[in-house]
Amino acid sequence: MDTKALRQKILDLAIHGKLVPQDPNDEPASVLLERIKAEKERLIKEGKIKRSKKSAKSSDTPHYENVPFEVPSSWVWTNIEELFFVTKLAGFEYTDCLTKDTISSNNEVPIVRAQNVRMGYFVENTNEAISEALSQQLERSALTKKCLLMTFIGAGIGDTCIFPALKRCHLAPNVAKIEPYSNKIDLKYALYYLMSDLGQLGVRGISKSTAQPSLSMATIRSLEIALPPLAEQHRIVAEIEKLFELIDQIEQGKADLQTIIKQTKSKILDLAIHGKLVPQDPNDEPAIELLKRINPDFTPCDNGHSRKLPQ
């Protein structure tokens, strides 16, 4: 069984609105999106975030006339920018502030590099850190609450995970912070969408085709996403995790079976070379006679160090 393909099929059904049934009592995603937009405008007005220079399509215009596929009537097509604040460590912050002199395992705030971001999971970093004081100076690229992280350059381009926010961390180069404007979106749903074949196709389709492929923050903001009602997002995530857990069990079972098969083969060979796999037949020609026929000059040697063989 191709469990990788099975996982992708589950994600494909999920993002098409076919994994769980729709509930007519759910608040439509169009209303949800307006709530999120209002929260975004509040954050901009309070100066907590800045409006991007190249803003995505205005909320006053219809979204995506050429949508990738049809979604249930309670869903809506949108993009990352209308749901998340997207930023990275600015170049001057890295060259001026994050230097060999300021990075040490003895500091308080771990920095998050591309190697800490794997597709679907976060790898905690304990080797490099900056001081709390320096992190406070670079508040924009600090990691203080749950958000998505995406590698935007190099071999792992498009790898996305959820930052668990167990402690304050800080962005290093090559990783984008994708922070929700509101708690009215399930981060796990957004993660699963970006992990799907369609989500990854979108990432690869907009990456710059150079020797070292890369994504700009503007292109990440433009990534399309099919948004279900919030209650349905939760149901989708619960169903995905239930099915993925079953696949994990299948994969573990396959691994255990392969181990058993390998051990069994080894045991069979061990029994065979010790003369214990099949019974000896007294009518068989002794092996010493066979050797004499193969090599007439053969002289048997009684080596006390050799194991005793079957008679």
Please give the residue ranges for each predicted region.
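Amphipathic alpha-helical segments
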Residues: K4, I15, W75-V76, D186, ...
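Residue-level "contact hotspot" at macromolecular interaction interfaces
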Residues: A142-L143
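A short glycine-rich beta-alpha junction/loop motif
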Residues: I153, R168-A176, I185-K188, K208-P228
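Short, ligand-facing micro-motifs at secondary-structure edges
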Residues: E93-T95, V117-I130, L148-A172, L187-Y192, ...
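Short amphipathic coiled-coil heptad-repeat segments
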Residues: M1-P24, S30-V31, E41, I49, ...
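Low-complexity, Lys/Gly-biased intrinsically disordered segments
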Residues: K45, H63, V76-M119, L134-L138, ...
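Non-catalytic DNA-recognition/assembly elements of restriction-modification systems
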Residues: K9, K18, Y64-Y94, S222, ...
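Short, solvent-exposed loop/turn positions at domain surfaces
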Residues: F69, Q136-Q137, S209
